[in-house]
From Swiss-Prot:
GO terms for biological process: putrescine biosynthetic process from arginine, via ornithine. Homodimer. Only the dimer is catalytically active, as the active sites are constructed of residues from both monomers. It catalyses: L-ornithine + H(+) = putrescine + CO2. Catalyzes the first and rate-limiting step of polyamine biosynthesis that converts ornithine into putrescine, which is the precursor for the polyamines, spermidine and spermine. Polyamines are essential for cell proliferation and are implicated in cellular processes, ranging from DNA replication to apoptosis. Substrate binds at Y314, Y315, D344. The record marks H191 as: Stacks against the aromatic ring of pyridoxal phosphate and stabilizes reaction intermediates. Its EC number is 4.1.1.17. This is Ornithine decarboxylase 2. It comes from Drosophila melanogaster. Its cofactor is pyridoxal 5'-phosphate. Pyridoxal 5'-phosphate binds at S194, G231, E265, P266, G267, R268, Y371. The modification N6-(pyridoxal phosphate)lysine is found at K62. GO terms for cellular component: cytoplasm. Belongs to the Orn/Lys/Arg decarboxylase class-II family.
């Protein structure tokens, strides 16, 4: 049980970041520190069940694959979206049954398919004829979930250029091919894009899914699973409520038969808000104009875009660090740049206004739980952040 995990520290009412920092002995810690509030995951799951009780969440492991996080969600009863052999190993190794897993990658290496077969992970996505032939050879008893393209007009990371067949031009042909080869198509899936901010995107996709279900049944497949993918926001609960209402309405209209199982692949929804990253200023320098006037303050932190900020390569955003200084808000602000620790000039986190800081001062960055640590690297020999876990008693 998670409650027996010695890596988790417990707090009474509310996690006090300042108190954690005071007790963390950061003066002697070279790398940055992640503070993960696991109770945030519990709150998110309660919100999910409240707003979308029919939709089974299958956590997207790629979003944050820390074993403590994955184990915590497993103990709460979520399913899992895995995309590789190693992700399957992680989840299965924690005691999760194969029935709670969808192998949600349309283009998998043959060795990964053979491993899924050995472990009886039967549900997996497909979006092209080559993958169907591969499945006939390596895992003919699997359940094929046809993934189609249906993108949001607003998303942080669109996925349609890489994955998803055309719902009208390709889906029927793929299901016919599967039938001819003696394979089972049991459902369909889509992904509107990571970090979706267009409510209507899900209804458009679910309408396409309804048509694919009808065609699949006509071909002779037993269609029984709809996967509505991911894209659910991690820090905008108001947006999530709007999306949930849209999904519920569309599902009830187009899939009223409760025997049809409906799952999803939320990632950032669960973990984005759970993490706060604490960085330390380890060096500073002043940039002055030719006449000697101070122009810019440069601060060098112990983490950067090769670490937990790596996602900024893909979707740059403004950062708003919290300062753990007395009366920080009242201090005069200076034009500043915060850099990561590496030698690479691309390792720049942000231009912003900050009070005068000194080596040893700390900056906190909230909402750092999604697509951060899995893509962080120790480039230039700088360690990736350490993570410490907390939970309400």
């Amino acid at each position: 049980m998670v409650n027996g995990d010695l890596r988790i520290q417990y707090y009474d009412e509310e996690l006090n970041i300042r108190k954690v920092i005071e007790q963390a002995d950061l003066e002697h810690l070279d790398q940055a520190l992640n503070i993960c509030d696991l109770s945030s995951l519990e709150r998110k799951l309660r919100l999910w069940h409240k707003l979308m009780p029919r939709i089974e969440p299958h956590y997207a492991v790629k979003c944050n694959d820390d074993p403590v996080v994955v184990k915590f969600l497993a103990d709460l009863g979520t399913g899992f979206d895995c995309a590789s052999k190693n992700e399957l190993k992680l989840v299965l190794g924690l005691g999760v049954s194969p029935e709670r897993i969808i192998f949600a990658h349309p283009c998998r290496p043959a060795s990964h398919l053979r491993y899924a077969k050995e472990q009886q992970v039967v549900n997996g996505t497909v979006d092209n004829e080559y993958e169907i032939y591969k499945l006939r050879k390596h895992y003919p008893d699997s359940n094929l979930i046809v993934r189609f393209k249906s993108e949001a007009k607003k998303a942080l990371c669109p996925l349609g250029d890489k994955y998803g067949c055309d719902a009208e031009a390709d889906a029927a042909a793929l299901m016919l091919l599967a039938k001819a080869l003696g394979l089972k198509v049991t459902g369909t899936s889509f992904h509107v894009g990571s970090g979706c901010s267009e409510v209507e995107a899900y209804d458009r996709a679910i309408e396409k899914a309804e048509n694919i279900f009808k065609v699949g049944e006509m071909i002779g497949h037993k269609m029984e699973l709809l996967d509505v993918g991911g894209g659910f926001p991690g820090i905008d609960d108001e947006m999530f409520e709007e999306i949930a209402q849209s999904v519920n309405t569309s599902v009830e209209l187009r899939f009223p038969d409760k025997r049809i199982r409906i799952i999803s692949e939320p990632g950032r929804f669960f973990v984005e808000a759970a993490y706060t990253l604490i960085c330390k200023v380890h060096a500073k320098r002043e940039v002055r104009s030719k006449d000697g006037k101070l122009d810019t303050m440069m601060y060098y932190l112990n983490d950067g875009i090769f670490g937990a900020f790596a996602g900024m390569f893909y979707y740059p955003e403004e950062v708003a660090p919290e300062l753990y200084l007395d009366e920080a808000e009242s201090l005069p602000k200076l034009k500043s740049v915060i850099w990561g620790p590496s030698c690479d000039a691309m390792d720049k986190i942000s231009d912003l206004l900050l009070p005068n800081l000194n080596p040893g001062d700390l900056l906190g960055f909230r909402n750092m739980g999604a697509y951060t640590m899995p893509i962080a690297s120790p480039f230039n020999g700088f360690d990736v952040p350490e993570t410490r876990f907390f939970k309400a008693k």
